[in-house]
Amino acid sequence: MSEERVIRINKVLRELNISLERAVDYLKDKGIAIDANPNAKISDSEFNILQSQFAGDKGNKEASKEVGEEKRKEKEALRVEREKEIEDKRRQEEERQKQQEIIKARAVVSGPVQVGKIDLNPKKPAAVSPEEPVKAEEPKTVTPTQTEKPVQKETVQSEPVAPVVSEEKKVEKPIITEKKEVKAESSKTAQEPIISTDPTTAEETITTQYQKLSGTTLTGQTIDLSQFNKPKKKKEDPKITPNKPGTPGVGNNNNANKNKRKRIAPKPGTPGAPKPATGNAPGTPNPNKITPNSGGGFNANRNARPGFVKGNRPAIVAKVEPTEEEVKNQIRETLEKLQGKGGKSKAAKYRRDKRETHRQKSDDEQRALDEGSKTIKVTEFVTVGEIAIMMDVPITKVIGTCMSLGIMVTMNQRLDAETLTIVADEFGYDVEFITVDIEEAIEVVEDREEDLVTRAPIVTVMGHVDHGKTSLLDYIRKENVIAGESGGITQHIGAYGVTLDNGQKIAFLDTPGHEAFTAMRARGAQVTDIAIIVIAADDDIMPQTKEAISHAQAAGVPIIFAINKVDKPNANPDKIKERLAGMNLLVEDWGGKIQSHDISAKTGLGVKELLEKVLLEAEILDLKSNPNKAAQGTVVEAYLDKGKGYVSTILVQHGTLKIGDYMLAGKHHGKVKAMHDERGHTVLTAGPSTPVSVLGLDGAATAGDKFNVFEDEKEAKQIASKRSQLMREQSVRTQRHITLDEIGRRIALGQFKELNVILKGDVDGSVEALSDSFSKLSTEEVQINIIHKGVGAITETDVNLASASDAIIIGFNVRPAGNARQLADKEEIDIRYYSIIYAAIDDLKDAMEGMLAPEMKEEVLGTAEIREIFKISKVGSIAGCMVTDGKILRTSKIRVIRDGVVVHTGELVALKRFKDDVKEVTKGYDCGIQIKGFNDIEISDVIEAYHEVAIKKKLK
C-alpha cells in the first residue's frame, strides 16, 4: 500500500525547499513527465528521486533555520539582559527615592510650632553663627526679657519672642522627662540636633556680641535630645566641621557648623514656608530673622547642599496635597466669588441666570449646526456620484473606498443603506435616511412556518461579453434570442421562466457582460439565489468575469462555474480551473467546494448535468416562500413601449401578483392592467420566483426598485408622492454648481471644453450603462455633462432643452416622437441614434477629440544658402540663394540661420526666379528671396523654410 501512496507536489516543494520548475525539469530529465501544477500528485518513487537529488537543499534549509533560531535566541537573551538591567536601575532609583522620602517625612513632621519660635529668638542676636536657633530654646526658662532686648535692636521681633519663650518652657519639660516620646515624634528629633549644638557655641557667640545672653548655659540639659538625632548629624558633620574648626568645646558639636548653614533654613521661611530643620511653623519670627542673614545663609546652604539643603527641600515639598473634595470646594467658592453669588440682589441673580441660559442655548444651536454639517440626508439607493457630491469628496476616492470594502461599483451605481453608512463613516459623515418613515408605512407581515412552500430557484447567468451566456439560455429555452439582439450582445437584463423535463421550474436572469453594465450585473446578483458564471474555455478570466464573481461573492450567492465552448479545438478547461485556483476559487475537480461543469451551449453538451447541479444547490438552500399574501419583489427592467405604454419587467419574490392589484414601485404607482411572460403570453397570476412583464405603472420604474402591492390605492399614492418629493429634494442637493476653483482651473487650462448630452433610451438599464460610460470619458480638457436622461422616445421637450443648453441628443433604440424631428431640424439640433453601446461610446469619444485644440507640429520643407546680396532702393535687400535641400514655397514661413543660430523668424515677401514670381523653387535651383521686415542678411546665411501642421489630439 505504501507504494501506491501519492503526495501533492507543493508539499514536496516545501519539504525539499525547491521551486516547482526545478522539480519538474529534474523529473523530466529522468523521463518522468508531470504537470507544472502545484496541486499535481507524485508517487513515492518519484518523491524518493527528488529527495535523493535535492537532499542538500533540504539540509541547507534546516541549517538556515538553526542559524536563524540561534540568532533569535541570542537577541532574546540580550533583550532579557537589557530589560533586567533597566529593571535593576529602576528598583535602585525607587529605593533611593524612598529613602529620601523618609527623610523628608521626618523633616516635615519635625516642624512643631513651639520649637520654631524658640529658634528665632537666639538667631537674631547672633548674625554670624548658626548657634542662635539653639539659643532660642535655651532662654526658655532662664531670661525671656534679656533675649527680647537684643532682638529688638537687630530686628523688630520682640513681640513674637515673648510668647515663644513661654511655649518653649512647656516643650522642655516633656522633652526631658520622656525621651521615648521624642523618638516617636520625628519633629523633635529633627529639632534636637540643633539644640544640642547650640549650648556651647551659643555661649561663645553671645559673649562676642552680647554679654546678656550668657545665661543660656542652663539649656545645656537638652544635649540629651541632640544625641537622639546623631544619625542626622552624621550626614551633615563631615561638611560642617571644616567650616568652623576653631570653636572650643564643640569638637563633637558639628551642629554649630550645621547651624551656620542652617541659616538658609529661614530663607524658605521668608515667603512663609515652614522651616524644616528647626521645625518652626509660625511665620512671623522667621521672615524677620532671615533678613540679616540671607546673604551668608544662602552661601552656607549652597555649600552644605548634600546635608542641609536636603533638609530644606522636604520642607518645601512637604506640603500636603489637597484632597479632591478640597479642590472641588475651592473651585466652587472661587466661582461663587467670580459670579458674585450671595452678595447680589435677586434681580441681579435673575439677569445673570437669564444671560447664562441664553449663552447655553446659543452654544447648543452652534453645536447642532456643526454636527448637522457632518450629517447627510439621503434616500436609500443613492448613486456613488451623488454621495460623493454630498460629502464633497472626489468620486474616485468613494469608488476606491468601496473597492477596499470588497464592493465593485461605478459612478452611477446605486448603493444600499448598509453600504452607504459604511462609506460615509469612512469619510467622517453620518447618514440620515429620510425615507425611514415611508418604509415603515409599508407593513411587512411575518410568514408562519406552515404557510411556507418550496419555490423555484432564481438563477443569474453572468460572465464576460461573448462568452456564451445568452447562448446557454437559448439552448435551455430552445429559442434563438441572440438573433434579435443588436450586435449579438445582451444590453439589458432578460428574465425567463423555464420548466425542465422533470417538471421543476427555474427562473433565469440574463445579465449583460459588457463593461458598461456593471450596475446591471450587481442588480442581478442582489435578487438571485444562485449565480452561474459562464467562462469560455478558449479564452481567459476576463475583467468582467472577475467583476461578476466579486458581485456574487459580495451578495453571498453560491457560484457554479459553467466552462463553455469546450467543443472548440483550442479549448483548455484546465487552464481556466488553474486561473480560478489562483483567485482562491477551487472547483470540486481540484478538491474545492465550488461546483463547475464543462459545457457547450451550442451543441448542448453538459447542459443537462449543469441544470442538475443548479437544482442540487437549490435543494441545499431549501428555498421557501409564502404565496398566499400580497406580492413583493424587485423591478428588473423598465421601458416605454409605443403601443402599450410603460412596461416593467418584475420578479415576484414573495406572495402572488394578480391582475387588478394596486402596485407601488419606487416613486411610480398604478393598477396592474396586464401581465405577460417572456414569450408574450398573457399571465393571470404570478407566484414566487416568477418573472413577468407588467403594464399599468405611470412611469418607468428604476431597475432595482422594490415593489409592493397595496389594498388601499390612496395610501400607495401618498407614499409615491412623498418619494417623488424626496427625490426632487435630493436632486437639488446633488446638483453641482460651478465653483471659483473650477473657474480658475478652466482659465488656467485655457482650452477647456464642455459637451452637453441629453440621453434617451429604451430601457432604464441601458440608459444607466450609457450614462456611466459617457461620464467616464470626461477628461481635464473636455467634460461631458449629461443634463438629462430618461426612458422613452425623444420628445419636443428634449429638443427645446437641447436648444437652450446647446446639447446633442443621443437616442439608444428610440426615435423622435411627434413633431420632435421637425423641431430639431429647425433648431439645428444634432440627434444621433444607436442600437449598440460600443458605437455610441466610440462616436462620443471622437466628438470629444474633435473638440480638443489640435497640436501644432513644424515640418521643415527645405533650406537655401545665400550666395549674393542685392540692395535695391525703396525695396530693401534681396538674397540671391541656391536651394540646397527640399523646396522653398512662397507661402512657407522661414528662419534665417547664421552660424547655427536663428537670427530671424518671419515670412517671405517675394520668391522670384529670374524676373518671374514663382510658387516654389526646388533643390538645385537658384532664386531671389525677399524677407518681410528683415534686411540684415549676410552671405552664407541659411534660409530654412517650414510650415506648421495641425495634428489631431487624442484623449488621454
Curated annotation (Swiss-Prot):
Residues 600-602 are annotated as: G5. InterPro entries: EF-G-like_DII, IF2_II, IF2_N, P-loop_NTPase, Small_GTP-bd, T_Tr_GTP-bd_dom, TF_IF2_bacterial-like, TIF_IF2. Residues 142-158, 209-229 have a biased composition (Polar residues). Transmembrane segments: none annotated. It holds the Pfam family IF2_N. GO terms for molecular function: GTP binding; GTPase activity; translation initiation factor activity. Residues 564-567 are annotated as: G4. CDD domains: IF2_eIF5B (cd01887), IF2_mtIF2_II (cd03702), mtIF2_IVc (cd03692). PROSITE patterns: G_TR_2, IF2. Residues 463-470 are annotated as: G1. Residues 488-492 are annotated as: G2. GO terms for cellular component: cytoplasm. Residues 58-102, 166-186, 353-371 have a biased composition (Basic and acidic residues). One of the essential components for the initiation of protein synthesis. Protects formylmethionyl-tRNA from spontaneous hydrolysis and promotes its binding to the 30S ribosomal subunits. Also involved in the hydrolysis of GTP during the formation of the 70S ribosomal complex. This is Translation initiation factor IF-2. It comes from Flavobacterium johnsoniae (strain ATCC 17061 / DSM 2064 / JCM 8514 / BCRC 14874 / CCUG 350202 / NBRC 14942 / NCIMB 11054 / UW101).
